[in-house]
Amino acid sequence: MKLDKQVWILAGGRLLLQFGTGFTLFYAPLFFVNQLGFSPTMVGIALGSASISGIVGRFLGGSWSDSPSWGRKKVLLLSAAISCLADVFLAGTYDYNTLLIGNLLMGLGIGFYWPPAEAMVADLTTRDQRNFAFALSRLGDSIGLGFGVAFGGVLIAVTGSYRLLFVIDGISFLVFYAIIYGAISDSGQKVLEKQTFWQGWGKTVKDYNLWIFCVVNVMFTTYVMQIQTTLPLYFTNFAVNPDDFTITRISSLFSLHIAFAAVFQLPIVKVINRLTHIQGLILSFLFWGVGFILIWWAGNSPDFAFLIAILAVLISAIALATYNPTASGFIVDLAPPSLRGIYFAINSQCWAIGNLIGPPLGGFVLDSGASYAHNFWLFSSASVFCGILILFILQNNINDGELTIDN
């Protein structure tokens, strides 16, 4: 499919950005808990604190992305600069206050990133191109993250230095800044309208369908955070057969998870293009439900636990690959072009809320003991039926014409 070259450049930039993130994402909880001695709950709170500043970043980033005086590009540059500063603090963490400051800054930087990044893809594509374009962006995320996790595991094995991972992450943000500065023009100038800061938000908050969607979106993002932050500690500390889950194996497992997401990201577009956005999200929920059951099985199995875990991350990767372009495409259909930044800000606020809920929830469950840790995955699997019910309600609202989607 022929796309604007800037879409490809953005995908390449995201690959680089996620390569740096992969160095830290799965190893940060292990570093802070097992080497610095913080409890899982304390680390969960610190990681979750990024969501507080992330809410501020998304709120401002969405509005500024829709402002002719700011635009998408300037907000992306601000995001990269703040995120690089965050890694300076995280690389130098020895006490809990520094850990909190680093995570608050990282949350702010990432908060600024998502609204303009997603809005740019929408600006540069047609409706027929968007599922593929959003999938391509997520493919860049997955490939970069996968290589980052893999090389991070090798780097830890060779050097034993977790702090070096944060240094490399900071360098990736600097390179990303250079790419955006030199190779990307501001895509939103043709569609942006002059309006006060609050006018755009006033129009957006009246979209009832958007708020219904946000409920299920928070569920999805909480699921993702359980895979990213809770699962490494669960397999490390609670698996019935801990020999199957060494640090090297966990590194390989999560590299496979991201590799699976990359492999299936573009092929899954052929499936979701035949479905409505609601149907695509229901399909994702079903995959998540199966994946959580397999995680429970892997944690409780005395034999073949690692093989079951591979199957679990395969299914959860397909769930993620199904969710990402479908959710972004649904937001584009809801949003007027001049308000895409704000709509994507609200969409990405769901990630902030998921980040706020997910790590502390997972940390609390793991602190509560083995039985709670094991059963948590079964409760997570059962929760998908609540999400599917909400999606049926949303579909009925659309079918009844209570609110229309601008195609």
What residues fall within each predicted segment?
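Conserved MFS/SLC helix-loop-helix module at the cytosolic interface between two early adjacent transmembrane helices
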Residues: 57-92
